[in-house]
Amino acid sequence: MYLEDIVKALNLRVVSGEERLTAEVLGGYVGDLLSDVMANSKEGDLWITRQTHQNIVAVASLKDHAGIILIQGCNPAADTLDKARKEGVPIMVTDMPGFEAIGKVYNMIATKKGPDPST
């Protein structure tokens, strides 16, 4: 599953990192506590959050996330956008509430990967 597929399917507004929409999304992570995201998210994850400050860019870059989705119409702060553009981190915005956005992203990724062989 590629980031551009999720952007199109969910009609996400891309505010930075347009050049990286071809990144492969390997999984997802949901969280607003940066230490939790740093400890538990993985490379290639699509991070879903309400946080809008510039530290989200640092975490996404450090963890090599596929991108960040900001939910409930949260727009990134100006310094966040500047940093994301400089570092090429894709940030997308949706008006969807978190539960809906998470469910849709999960279904897209799970369907693309196929059934879990461990179940």
What is each of the regions a protein language model found here?
Residues 1-18:
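N-terminal, charge-rich interaction modules
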Residues 22-23, 31-46, 50-119:
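Feature captures the catalytic cores and cofactor-binding loops of soluble hydro-lyases/lyases
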Residues 26:
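Histidine/lysine/aspartate-rich catalytic loop segments that bind and position anionic ligands
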